[in-house]
């Protein structure tokens, strides 16, 4: 109950601080809390992270279908939807990675269904804001990097640095 109020207070204070402070002071603790609440289900799954400016959804979907066709127990979390077992779950993410609570809930559901592989589409915003923390992908895929999202990242170097976080985890 108190967690809800603390998160609400932090959300209200966000505009007062630079993005890097928000990322480490708000997003990272939120990701740690979500992982703790859901029992860090990602540690029991083989995560394949896919990032890039363009082609993330297509590449993630192709990897998902390759593994599924090979008979592997696989799930997919993309900006379009999540595929868990025989279900397509509308996520409402559409253009970005899920918030840590939604992601951890999906991963716990996948773990409970004995899924082994999860193909996870990851955006630069999601990486910068620790949305997938503490997940450590076994495989990381980069489709490409072009001059996009500079409204958020401000410089191309900062954008590249955000994308590379997937490979450092």
List each model region and its residues.
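Phosphate-binding loop of NTP-binding sites
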Residues: 10-169
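Long, basic/Gly/Ser/Thr-rich N-terminal segments
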Residues: 1-4
């Amino acid at each position: 109950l108190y967690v809800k109020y603390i998160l609400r207070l932090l959300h209200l204070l966000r505009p007062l601080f630079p993005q890097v402070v928000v990322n480490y002071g708000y997003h990272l603790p939120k990701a740690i809390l979500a992982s703790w609440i859901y029992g860090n289900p990602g540690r029991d799954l083989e995560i394949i992270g896919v990032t890039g400016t363009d082609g993330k959804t297509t590449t993630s979907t192709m990897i998902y279908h390759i593994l599924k066709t090979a008979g592997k127990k696989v799930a997919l979390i993309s900006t379009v939807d999540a595929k868990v077992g025989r279900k397509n779950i509308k996520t409402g993410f559409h253009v970005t990675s899920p918030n840590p609570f939604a992601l951890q809930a999906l991963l716990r559901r996948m773990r409970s269904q004995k899924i082994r592989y999860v193909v996870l589409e990851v955006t630069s915003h999601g990486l910068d804001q620790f949305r997938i923390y503490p997940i450590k992908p076994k495989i990381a895929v980069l489709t490409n990097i072009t001059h996009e999202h500079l409204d958020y990242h401000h410089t191309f170097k900062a954008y590249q640095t955000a994308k590379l976080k997937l490979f450092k985890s």
